[in-house]
Amino acid sequence: MKILVLEHELPNATAEQFQQFAVAEARKAWDLHQTGIIRELYFRADQNEAILVLERASVNEAQEALSTLPFVQNKLITFEVIPLKAYSGFERLFAKD
């Protein structure tokens, strides 16, 4: 299942805390990418938050993988996890009237 993930910084997180765990976060994100869990990873252009595309069997599996990230473990960020399905709108082009 393809899963869209939106990062949200928690209000009490400080720049110093992010700096403290930045290398460990990048290393873990790299590991998740190399194992195929994180398929795509971006920063938003309008703010300093990440957008991820994960491939997992379920939302629960995605949340388990995300919980291994140091920023999550140290309560600096949270994620909005959105399961996706294939777009079926093109079927309308071929429907018999």
Spans of model-derived segments:
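Conserved, structured core segments of small domains
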Residues: 1-97
